[in-house]
Amino acid sequence: MNFIGLTSLVKRLPFYADDVKQNIKELFSKELEGLAIRQMYGIALAAGYYLKNEQMLNCIRAEAKIHLEEADATAAKFAVVVTSMTSTYHNFNSSVTDEEIKALPADLHLSAFSDPSILKTDFELYCLAISIFLKCKYCTDLHIKSLISQGVSKAAINNVARIVSVLRAAKAALEIENIRSYEFIARGPNF
């Protein structure tokens, strides 16, 4: 299989993001341990939707189209929305000290988890990616346990975190470059 390696994204990154460029090239130049190419690009697409950076999302989307079906793209969107909801609730619940409130049921609809057009493992991988962004310990642990029970390796789970970390850094670099400001010029003490 010919890997493009998100080259259009790498080309947009500034020189001070060389580590990020190198990591993107390495992550998307070959199949990562425990993840199919489709899953790698699905994770990247879910991350792109979550990060909401149009430049990055367009770069990811252009290459993801080669590896994904429309159902995969929809699953990535579902993952962002559902995980945003559940992570917010579980972060709230874990921060509450009142035991009566903690004991109340969430009663949140989660129909995306039962959608037959979405492969359960892929959807869980996408949800894990978003849980990592949202720093929801409860959701992250829940998705990891579910993925392990489905036969996903710990190396694959670690690779999800690697993809998410690198794409968040890429977004930061792109946003710095889009800030309208004058270049930083150091001046001597006598200026």
Describe the function of each predicted region.
Residues 123:
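Basic- and aromatic-enriched surface patches that contact anionic nucleotides/nucleic acids
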Residues 137-158:
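Short conserved catalytic/interaction loops centered on acidic-Pro-aromatic/His motifs
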Residues 161-162:
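Interfacial loop-to-transmembrane junctions
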Residues 43-59, 126-142:
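Short, thiol/selenol-centered motifs that function as redox-active sites or metal-ligating centers
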Residues 1-39, 45-118, 148-149, 156, ...:
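Acidic, glycine/proline-rich low-complexity segments that act as flexible tails and inter-domain linkers
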